[in-house]
């Protein structure tokens, strides 16, 4: 999604909606989003251009809530924004993915979460699990009982959320 006039593609099984990390939801994005709603297309969201000056992941996610009136579920958070963007944190697997700048991010390495981000990652993961738990009784029960929550608990709940278009997973990066 991202351009007006995609009616032929909206009859598909799903779509990835691209949003600008600097501008968030733009008018043409709203138009295409409404077309996808009309055709009941499940969607994932990708906040793009996180390496640009002025990129602000939290503001872009807030624009999804405010302008599209949807329930975004943040799945990744950026490691740095704008010129400082150097990777992402995968909230499901709790891993840092550092992109190599010499090949423009084509290669990467998995790493531990940077200590200075540990608290914000814990908080973001908690929000993700709570949002996913709305779509799975077993996940909700595990979470409420303080049991460890794994990928196998989270992914089916997110799938349900996406297929029912009740919530939209949000990823980020720079393509």
Regions found by a protein language model. Name each.
Residues 20-175:
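P-loop NTPase catalytic nucleotide-binding module
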Residues 1-3, 105-106:
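P-loop NTPase nucleotide-binding/switch module
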Residues 2-22:
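Inter-motif core of Ras-like GTPase G domains
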């Amino acid at each position: 999604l991202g351009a007006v006039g995609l009616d032929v593609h909206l009859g598909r099984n799903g779509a990835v909606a691209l949003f600008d990390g600097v501008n968030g939801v733009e008018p043409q994005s709203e138009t295409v989003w409404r077309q996808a709603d009309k055709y009941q297309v499940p969607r994932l969201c990708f906040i793009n251009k996180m390496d640009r000056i002025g990129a602000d992941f939290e503001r872009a996610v807030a624009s999804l809530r405010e302008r599209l009136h949807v329930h975004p579920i943040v799945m990744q958070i950026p490691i740095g924004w704008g010129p400082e963007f150097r990777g992402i944190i995968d909230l499901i697997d709790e891993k840092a993915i550092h992109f190599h700048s010499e090949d423009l991010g084509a290669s990467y390495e998995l790493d531990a979460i940077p200590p200075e981000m540990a608290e914000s990652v814990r908080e973001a993961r908690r929000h993700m699990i709570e949002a996913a738990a709305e779509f799975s009784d077993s996940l909700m029960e595990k979470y409420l009982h303080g049991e460890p929550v794994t990928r196998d608990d989270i992914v089916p709940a997110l799938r349900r959320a996406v297929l029912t278009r009740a919530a939209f997973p949000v990823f980020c990066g720079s393509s």
